[in-house]
UniProtKB/Swiss-Prot annotation:
InterPro entries: Asp/Orn_carbamoyltranf_P-bd, Asp/Orn_carbamoylTrfase, Asp/Orn_carbamoylTrfase_sf, Asp_carbamoyltransf_Asp/Orn-bd, Orn/put_carbamltrans, OTCase_ArgI
Chain sites annotated for binding L-ornithine: N167, D231, S235, M236
Organism lineage string: Bacteria, Bacillati, Bacillota, Bacilli, Lactobacillales
Record-linked PROSITE patterns: CARBAMOYLTRANSFERASE
Gene: arcB2
GO cellular component, one term: cytoplasm
UniProt source species: Streptococcus agalactiae serotype V (strain ATCC BAA-611 / 2603 V/R)
Protein known as: Ornithine carbamoyltransferase 2, catabolic
GO molecular function annotation: amino acid binding; ornithine carbamoyltransferase activity
Residues engaged in binding carbamoyl phosphate: S57, T58, R59, T60, Q84, R108, H135, P136, T137, Q138, C272, L273, R317
């Protein structure tokens, strides 16, 4: 019997059905429970995992490393200075070599096409740790965190505030509407999501009963909010746009005034991290000195408030990544979902 996940890559949310995505979230919760109870789950005993990183990372690298070790696998980190992808060696050739040596490959970098080529030519499961277009492993952690807090996903309303064109916004739109979550993008018109992403989300919403809203009107955006979500105003590779983004996105900051507008004491705040909520970073100090802004996408008050769930969310990166690796590489009996 064909197994649902075995041998598959995890490249973008749109590659999976609602049932498959929800299964991975529930499987993540199961693995989290095993971890908390100290029950071994070495589904990948003897496997070797390549971790390819063009972009720097704290959570993704730590999550893949600890998840692989918990599963009994050996993770091998290959940073930007260790791999030749497209420079001295084509992605196709690199993929064919790594596929002979490793049982699975994680890639975190810029190009979605590159992670797709790794999957096409390596012959082993490839997992997208982040590209400029999509962030699917983040979505499993995000929606697991939401389900842990509300007991469900369908009918929940998530409001994303900030740069509506980035990979996290794309993924929240598609993954959310796939599973019946209402997704509001609160963003300036200049940073609205790409039309094809919104169209895809609207197609999913028709099937799941969710709705999509893209607006720069704060009152429309916060209506019915259960979850506020934000991300950095400047993505990796866009550091030259700090001034422009700070000025453009200041009205879209998640602060206590915005939280109170939702009139929902049970709402939660999420952030994929890192967050610029104070001046305790080099970036934070630099922005404060140059633009007089001490808090960017979220205020320190909200970041440390009772609404905050971002550290639970960060922990869930590990549990959800573990679920993806185990499901696609562990020869588990998952005949259908």
């Amino acid at each position: 019997m064909t197994q649902v996940f075995q041998g598959r890559s995890f490249l973008a949310e749109k590659d999976f059905s609602r049932e498959e995505f929800e299964y991975l979230i529930d499987f993540s919760a199961h693995l989290k429970d095993l971890k908390k109870r100290g029950v071994p789950h070495h589904y990948l005993e003897g496997k070797n995992i390549a971790l390819l990183f063009e972009k720097t990372s704290t959570r993704t690298r730590a999550a893949f490393t600890t998840a692989a070790i918990d599963l009994g696998a050996h993770p091998e980190y290959l940073g930007a200075n260790d791999i030749q992808l497209g420079k001295k060696e084509s992605t196709e050739d690199t993929a064919k070599v790594l596929g002979r040596m490793f049982d699975g490959i994680e890639f975190r970098g810029f190009s979605q096409r590159m992670v797709e080529e790794l999957a096409e030519f390596s012959g082993v499961p490839v997992w997208n740790g982040l590209t400029d277009e999509w962030h699917p492993t983040q979505m499993l952690a995000d929606y697991l965190t939401i389900k842990e807090n509300f007991g469900k996903l369908e009918g929940i309303t998530l409001v994303y505030c900030g740069d509506g064109r980035n990979n996290v916004a794309n993924s929240l739109l598609v993954a959310g509407t796939l599973m019946g979550v209402n997704v509001h993008i609160f963003s300036p018109k200049e940073l609205f999501p790409a039309e094809e992403i919104v169209k895809l989300a609207e197609e999913y919403a028709k099937e799941s009963g969710a709705h999509v809203l893209v607006t720069d009107n704060v009152d429309e955006a916060v209506k019915g909010a259960d979850v506020f979500y934000t991300d950095v105003w400047v993505s990796m590779g866009e550091e030259d746009k700090f001034k422009e983004r700070v000025e453009l996105l200041q009205p879209y900051q998640v602060n206590m005034e915005l939280i109170k507008k939702a009139n929902n004491d049970n709402l939660i705040f999420l952030h994929c991290l890192p967050a610029f909520h104070d001046t305790n970073t080099v970036y934070g100090k630099d922005v404060a000195e140059k633009f007089g802004v001490k808090e960017m996408e979220v205020t320190d008050e909200v970041f440390r408030s009772k609404y905050a769930r971002h550290f639970d969310q960060a922990e869930n990166r590990m549990h959800t990544i573990k679920a993806v690796m185990a499901a696609t590489l562990g020869n588990l009996f998952i005949p259908k979902v």
